[in-house]
Amino acid sequence: AVIFTLDWHPGNHCSFAANGGQWPSHCVAYTQGAGLPDEFAGILASGKAKLFLKGQEQDKEQYGAFEDLATDSIEYAWLSNADSVDVCGIAGDYCVKASTENVLKVVAPEKVSILTDCVRSIDGGEALEAFINEKGITKK
């Protein structure tokens, strides 16, 4: 299974520094920089991948892509039927780590890998490395 997740924030999201949060404004819905690169359009159009949005609620910080994963959700079905799950993205110490924690509620650790060359962390990778070692996740 190929699953893409995107932050898709309203312009007044609570995580933004201008609204009292800790992050600069980023991934504002329908703006440049919020979407997937054009190179991914083909796999999405093929039906072999699924796109899920997160961070859409103005007053809720959401690091994990699957925080509120209900067993009857599309996300749960995709994850539970996956032969393997490779995780990558930004930021390794926040969203990638939290999303992987969410995935591990559904998928056994031996089926989960972190694509470390495709991850960037704010802390240089220390928190994610510790998490990978603690959970016994494979690095690719």
Spans of features found by a protein language model:
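Conserved phosphoryl-transfer catalytic core
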Residues: 1-5
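Active-site-adjacent betaalpha module
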Residues: 10-18, 24-140
